[in-house]
Structure formats: C-alpha cells, structure tokens
Amino acid sequence: MDDNYQVCFTPSGRQYKGEFGDTLLQVAQDAGVAIRSLCGGYGQCHQCWIEVSEGEHSKFGVKCDPENVTAVTRLEKQLIADNPTYKGKRLACQSCIQGDLVIDVPEESQEHKAYISKKNAKQNYSVASSISLFDCNLEESTLDENPSASENLLAQLEKQGVKASIDFNLLASLQPLIHSSKGKLTVAVRDKNQIVATYPQGKHQIFGGAIDIGSTTLALYVYDLKDGKLVYESSAMNPQIRFGEDLMSRVSYVMMNKGGDEKLTAAVRGKITEMLHDACENLETEWDKLLEVVLVGNPIMHHIFFGISPVELGQAPFTLSIRSWLDVDAKDLSLDLYPKTRLSFFPLIAGHVGADTAAAYLSQIDIMHSKTTLLVDIGTNAEIMLSKEGKVYATSSPTGPAFEGAEISSGVRATYGAIERVRIDKETLKVRFKVIGCDAWSDEPNFELVKMKAVGICGSGIIEAIVALAEAGIIDQSGLFVESVAPELFSKKGNTSRFLLVDQGDKSIYIEQVDIRSIQLAKAALSAGVSILMDYLDCDHFDKILLAGAFGAHLDARYVALLDIIPTSTAEKIVSVGNAAGIGASAALLDINKRQTIIEAVEKVVKIETATEPRFQEFFVDAMKFSVSPVKQQATKKVRRRKRVS
C-alpha cells in the first residue's frame, strides 16, 4: 500500500506528495505554500483555515473524497460554533492526510498573498451615464388636488422634460420619504425613462462598477458616474479555482459532479457581491448609490455567472446559450445588493471568443479600424483578433495553462517569490533572475532572497528562461536539451532530463525537458491561430501587435518576438495594453453610447473556428521550432510528454 498521497494547492498550483498522517500545514510548508501560522501549527492562533475541495479534479488527476482527510476536531467544531463563517473550512494544522486532496488556501490565510495585477492605467473616458439625477419639489396635496404620490412625482419630472415610470419596488418607501423630506426629493432616473432610486434632496454621488471576471482573477473598478473619476479598485482570486485551475477543468467538474454548476455560480456571485460590499464600505456610501455594474468575461465565465450550464461549451460545436448584450437587475439574480442595481454583460462574439475580447476590442477600436492590428489576450485559451482594411476576424486557440506557470515542473502562478525575469550569460551560463515582490536582481547586494527562497517560476519567467537557454545553445531548434554544453548543470528525474536554473538545495528550481515541450505546444497553438487569421485576411505584416491582459502586461516584448509566439513579430511593434477588457468595460459603463458601438461592431466580426481549420495542423507544426537557437536539430531522441488531462 502506498502511503504517499498527492496534495494540490490552489491558487498557487503547487503540488506535493505527502505521507499518510501528515498535517496539511506540514505538507503546505514542504510544498512552499505559505499559510499563516503564528503558533507554529499547535492550534492556538486559528489562522490557517483552508478549504478541502471535492469531486474529480481532472486538471490534477485527483479525485477528492471527504474521507481523504481526518474528521473535524473538537477544537474546529468549537471555533465553527463560535463563528459560523468558518463552516466548511478546516484548520490546516488540525487536518491530516488520508488520501489525495486538492486544497484551496483563501486569501486571508495566505502568508504571501497571490500577486494580482489588473490595475487600470489612468484613462480619459467620455461620460454619458445611463443614470441622471433630478431634484423634485413635490406640491402639497389638498382635498381638491390630491394626486397619488407617484403621479405627483412623475408630474414633477415631466416638467423637467423627463417622461418616466416608477419601479414597483419603490412605491412602499415613497410616501414615507416624501413626508420625512417635506416633499423635497432627488430622483435617480435610468435611461431617461425609469425611476430606480429616490433620496432626500441633496448632493448625491452615484457610482458604477466595471468587473472583469477572469478565470483566475476578478477585477473591480468603481467610478463616479457624474464625472467618470475612478474612485476605487480591487482584485481577488476567482474562488472557482478550487473546482478546477483552467476552464475545461471546471466544465469537467460540472459534468462529473451533481450540482457542480450551482457551486461554481454561487462561488463567483458571492465573491463579486463581497467585493462590491467592500467598495461601498470603503467609499462610505449606501448600496442604493451603486446603480450600474458592467461585466465582461469569457463565455464559460459568462454562462456560469448567469447560472447557465457551461457543458455545451466543453464540446464542439461550442454553442452559446445567448450572445447578445444582457441586462438584469440584482434582484433577478438574488444578489445581496440594491435590488435595482443593473448588471450588464457585454455581448459574446462566438464559441470561446467572449465578452472580455469584445471589451478589449472596444478599448482599442480606433486603432483596429485604422491600422492592420493584431490583438491577443494570452491565457489558457488565447483569444485573437486581427483587423485589416476595416475587416475584423477573431479566433481562439487552446494554448493550455503552461504560459501561466501550470503544467511546468517548478511552475507557479504569479505570486510573491515567483521568478518572473531570467537572464543567462551566453559565455559563462551564469543565471540571473528577479522574483515578484523584489525589485533587485539575484546578483545585486540588496536582493532579499536570503529571507525567502524562490517559490517557483511563473509564466513570464518560464518564457524568458527558455528563450535564454535557446540563445545560449542549451536548447536546440527542435526543443531538445543540448546537454553536452554544460553537463554539470543537468541531471535526471526519472527518464526526464532537467537543467538546474536556481540552486536552492532541496528547493532548487529546474527546467525539465517536458516543460520545454509544454511551452512549445502552447506557443505553437497560439502562433497557428494567428497564422490562420493572417491567411484569411491575406496579411503578411502587422502595424501594431497589442498584448492584452495581466499576463501580457508582464511579458517582455523582446522575448515574445524571440520565442516566435506571434509570426513575423518584432519587438518594436509589440505593445502591452494592460487590462484592455477592464478598460472596455469601464468605457461602456461611463458612456451609454459605447454600448451600442460594441453591439454593432461585434455583429461584424467574422469568427473562425481553429478546431475545424484544415491548415491548423500545418501551421502548428511549423511553429514548434525555436529559431533563436544557434543549434540545429540534433539526432532524433524520443521525448516523453507529460500526459495532459482535459
């Protein structure tokens, strides 16, 4: 009987083999996952709360069963009784392994919180809000002139040129408000025809939120709807990550676990509601002042948010339940918000090209309509748009999670302590690197790694490492290691060769042969998707290459060009546009006219499905090469590929 069990941690993506009876805190520490534990694991500080996932997790190849961890202890039962918010959670120091597990470490339990970067650079947005405020002085009723309270209010609005209706849910509070304010009201009117909130007359600040629902990260931007000023922003890990690290894993979870779709929906709605509550608290405002929320996300995130099963999107022909712009009130989704807060979701384009891509398109629409422009959001499913001479084509390409550090032997998501930059001297093969959270390079005096070892390598780091290895001739053009260049830096892990990148004793960081293959497959898939669009539009160059998303913002243009992720690209044409989806969502929140702009623009986009394209395989094979390497392909060696589970 094997007493070693696989324990996988989210959101970091770290995996480790723990022994039967080990506490989850011990395993986390061995895996380099930093969980808060001031008492050292003696059950005294009560800070190491974690959540044990359940069901089949195909991404990790793990099936979680409630009996794979020891029973809830008396201490935990008492703490949960005292604070019901702990229900469903466990103390890592009190929970012992009895089988394979997937463990979610919530943000409040992380010693080094996940590095989340989806901040919006300052933008100059046009403002034409859907919400307008009107001051109304209601005339006192008499026996001779005694209209209803609602008629009185509507008449006052009509005098100001507004013909509106009043929402039924406001009627119960209208007369008490009229009496308490002596008939002096400020009224919020949506789309110039519907009263959605009433307040005592005065100066009121009305807010709106733009939300980017990423598969990994949720980003919120809150604006003053009058002047368009950004007043608050926040981001958080998408709590769905505990059900599957990538999109297809979450679809698989829904397919294999009864009620799985409801759990995914509840998780994301709950987190978004929490973020909006925090925003209102931070702004010291009431919920009825947050009246508009615009959301974007990929098709699977869209469907799950609305409680629509994503299963159809897990298999061809990837049929959407709905594509169009969608408006719903908070009460229709049973969200714990002001009932008439309107939640608006951008239109989807088709298949796996979603509302986030549509929003990114809106944010860059001027340049895309004037120049030959490639817009790429690199993620587990790359979304690609190409514009030329007024035509816009779009596709998605299954790059997998390697670019985000997953499926890499020492890979982690972007978290503090993760290697994000790598340089290798071509002559000495000396490695220099930077980690997230420290501005200094590893060979500089003020480098702070004496306090914290590198926890792994994230997506930008693995890209730079592989390019640097290829430039130094340590990887040949086919992607195989050239071990004869520096045999002392190579070792074996089973049947796989690995290169020592950072020597940290038993916590050393390696690049394995299968890691190179994972990046090779990812870059070939993305490159093939771009090539297909170039083929359709008879395009042989780009005026601009726009990298969207938080990951794109961290990529060095030189390394993107050298890795041949994008055909014919040169570093000077590559520009990071940051969280373009968040920028587009913000633009549509603040200017009602932008909504019609993107609704009409999306209808003209031609969607190409790579899965059915006969030339995809041809382009894919061509893109496998590492042209930056000076070493041509060596004698063929069979390379073991890590089994990818979908």
Residue ranges and their predicted role:
Residues 3-5, 77-210, 215, 264-269, ...:
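Nucleotide/phosphate-binding catalytic cleft detector across ATP-hydrolyzing
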Residues 34-66, 73-74, 81-100:
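Local cysteine-cluster metal-coordination motifs and their immediate loop/turn environment
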Residues 211-215, 220-248, 311-325, 359, ...:
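Glycine-rich phosphate-binding loop of actin/hexokinase-like ATP-binding domains
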Residues 239-282, 407, 416-424, 518, ...:
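N-terminal phosphate-binding loop and adjacent alpha-helix
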Residues 297-312, 387, 539, 550-569, ...:
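Short glycine/threonine-rich loop-to-helix capping motif typified by GTGT followed
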Residues 335-336, 348-363, 520-524, 574-611:
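Glycine-rich phosphate-binding/hydrolytic loop that grips phosphoryl groups
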Residues 388, 393, 531, 535-602:
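Catalytic phosphate/nucleotide-handling subdomain of diverse soluble enzymes
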Residues 470-537:
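A contiguous, well-structured pocket-lining segment that forms one wall/lid of small-molecule binding clefts
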